[in-house]
């Protein structure tokens, strides 16, 4: 049973501007593991990566119903890729989390569907 849905869209140029103060922004948004992946990226690929993670975390927090804040922070949510490259969310939840991330020339968008773990 679906228990939550969240979606977020972010302009890539907004993330690109925030990456000017790269380290501080990335430390606030990305987990240590995500920052390790980001270290190997440059230019537009780095912007897309960070924007996708930002949108995914915002979408997850909306699906949970809290938004980013006291109950859920950016660092409580980690986005990884499975063996096939599919993005997945790692967090402390009893729900099954379905994640989709997409990019265009100007935007990154993510959608999260939370499903009850009891079937």
UniProtKB/Swiss-Prot annotation:
Keyword field contains Metal-binding: yes
This protein's record includes keyword Phosphoprotein: no
Gene3D superfamilies recorded: 4'-phosphopantetheinyl transferase domain
Primary localization: cytoplasm
GO CC terms in record: cytosol
Biological processes annotated in GO: fatty acid biosynthetic process; lysine biosynthetic process via aminoadipic acid
Cofactor(s) named in the record: Mg(2+)
Chain residues that bind Mg(2+): 8, 58
EC number(s) per entry: 2.7.8.7
Domain of life according to the entry: Bacteria
UniProt xrefs under SUPFAM superfamilies: 4'-phosphopantetheinyl transferase
Family: Belongs to the P-Pant transferase superfamily. AcpS family.
NCBIfam families reported in the protein's UniProt record: acpS, pantethn_trn
Protein name as annotated: Holo-[acyl-carrier-protein] synthase
Gene symbol of the encoding locus: acpS
């Amino acid at each position: 049973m679906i228990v939550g849905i969240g979606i977020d869209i972010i302009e890539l140029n907004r993330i690109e501007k925030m990456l000017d103060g790269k380290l501080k922004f990335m430390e606030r948004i990305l987990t240590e593991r995500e920052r390790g992946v980001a270290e190997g990226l440059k230019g537009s690929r780095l912007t897309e990566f960070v924007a996708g993670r930002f949108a995914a975390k915002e979408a997850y927090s909306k699906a949970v119903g809290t938004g980013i804040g006291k109950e859920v922070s950016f660092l409580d949510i980690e986005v990884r890729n499975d063996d096939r490259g599919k993005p997945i969310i790692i967090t402390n939840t009893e729900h099954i989390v379905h994640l989709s991330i997409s990019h265009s020339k100007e935007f990154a968008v993510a959608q999260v569907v939370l499903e009850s773990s009891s079937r």
